[in-house]
């Protein structure tokens, strides 16, 4: 399992996260049918919020030589439940434990209720987020389908809710 560093994104990280964002949105387009803007970019208001809104936080995961392995965006830091809004691991690091290590560090920083959304069609995400919920809450987590606001033609998102009531051991078990 690779050694990773997980930390809050700083202003200097923004160009790197913007590049990773393009990869993330490209991956997600398989499930949401989204096309890039005419200039080749994708919607990025969530990315902007991670750097500009105090109720949001961006995280970066890096490996040896500070090479990027992924990022996460959390919203509702002051709300009743934190929402893991966006989560991305570069393809070469998927299924290597990077995602579980990263989410463990992030969730441990914000104990309490959490929610994460993903698409039923994304079988890898389905397995991963159910495993994450079980790691943190045992069998005490819930799953529901919620329509996507403004997109009635898309299948509903799957939302998992769990509570991280204590500092979680960041070593995957």
Stretches with model-predicted labels:
Residues 47-60:
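A short helix-loop-beta-strand connector motif used in the catalytic cores of GNAT acetyltransferases and
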Residues 144-173:
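Acyl-donor (CoA/ACP) binding surface of acyl/acetyltransferases
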Residues 89, 95-108:
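Conserved acetyl-CoA-binding loop-helix of GNAT-fold acetyltransferases
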Residues 110-122:
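Conserved GNAT acetyl-CoA-binding A-motif
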Residues 4-19, 28:
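A short beta-loop-alpha structural element at the N-terminal edge
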Residues 25-47:
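Conserved GNAT-fold acetyl-CoA-binding loop/helix
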Residues 100, 120-144, 150-151:
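Conserved active-site alpha-helix within GNAT-family acetyltransferase domains
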Residues 58-60, 66-76, 83, 88:
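Conserved beta-strand in the GNAT
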